[in-house]
């Protein structure tokens, strides 16, 4: 699958996870509704599904990975920033095939696209500290 299709999968995952985090609906229902309502012809749908289920299943673990590096309480994080960080931390901790720099750079781009004005700086700061702990060899 093309890198652009992976990027689109991440973009869709941010949107779907944002909805899930706010609604607390079952992740399978969120996925079904998202895929029914969105044009996903240029999306790596399998990767989108993996990101959604992986983040939802591991959300407490992923939150634990980010907490030591947050400058504020987890509960005070914006929902977009939380979704972006969860995706990046999922890729860093559970998907060793995703290069270290790709996971971080994609997260920064997602934060620029969907987040508040300076959220990409916040996301970069958290990942800059967390990533070397998760992947000490930076691969």
UniProtKB/Swiss-Prot annotation:
One of its GO terms (biological process) is transcription antitermination. GO terms for cellular component: cytosol. CDD domains: Terminator_NusB. One of its GO terms (molecular function) is RNA binding. The keyword Kinase does not apply. Keywords: RNA-binding, Transcription, Transcription antitermination, Transcription regulation. Pfam families: NusB. It comes from the Bacteria. InterPro entries: NusB-like_sf (IPR035926), NusB_fam (IPR011605), NusB_RsmB_TIM44 (IPR006027). Involved in transcription antitermination. Required for transcription of ribosomal RNA (rRNA) genes. Binds specifically to the boxA antiterminator sequence of the ribosomal RNA (rrn) operons. NCBIfam families: nusB (TIGR01951). Belongs to the NusB family. This is Transcription antitermination protein NusB. The lineage of its organism: Bacteria, Pseudomonadati, Pseudomonadota, Gammaproteobacteria, Enterobacterales.
